[in-house]
């Protein structure tokens, strides 16, 4: 069991200490957004389909700079993670669509 913990440590925890992530989004979109707003230390974003507060996030880099915003996702699990990890944000479990009405 100890060997598994060592493997986990070296694969997942240690690299984050010595090599911090520069991008949290899937394809570096957050780097583009960060460069576009490089002189703004505070701001407001709306993230529709937010998925996860860290992995694949287009807004986490902005959050680290002091921004806050609204996060929408249909997954209850995702919204619970956002509420736990991003205290300055407002996270809402809801779908966004151009159709009115309630989904079954």
Features from the language model and the residues they span:
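Phosphate/nucleotide-binding beta-alpha loop and adjacent structural elements of enzyme active sites
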Residues: 1-104
